């Protein structure tokens, strides 16, 4: 998760619109697959750069989430294990790249306007709530 004003402030969050299957057109947090030999932190930084044009520093572990997508017959078609971290932008120019159609900074009040991949909205809302609790 990448917040525009850094992980300690509650500004807009960066979303990427998927450019290919599965779930083409849906919005999600930037990310992707690890390459052989990469650490989680290296893979996150590489994927964010490829998808958004931004260089990031991985700041803290957020959580692990599982997502199973089933076909019409109920069989598992995709099974994802998502490891989320909070990141801070170091530089770069925001632009859609790699396998995304668009990237946008989205304010919390507008999140429900975006068609997101399953579970993404609840993860983001919890991140905002967690950040608010840390501030008090």
Regions found by a protein language model. Give the residues of each.
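Structural detector for helix-capping/boundary residues
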Residues: 32, 46, 59, 106-109, ...
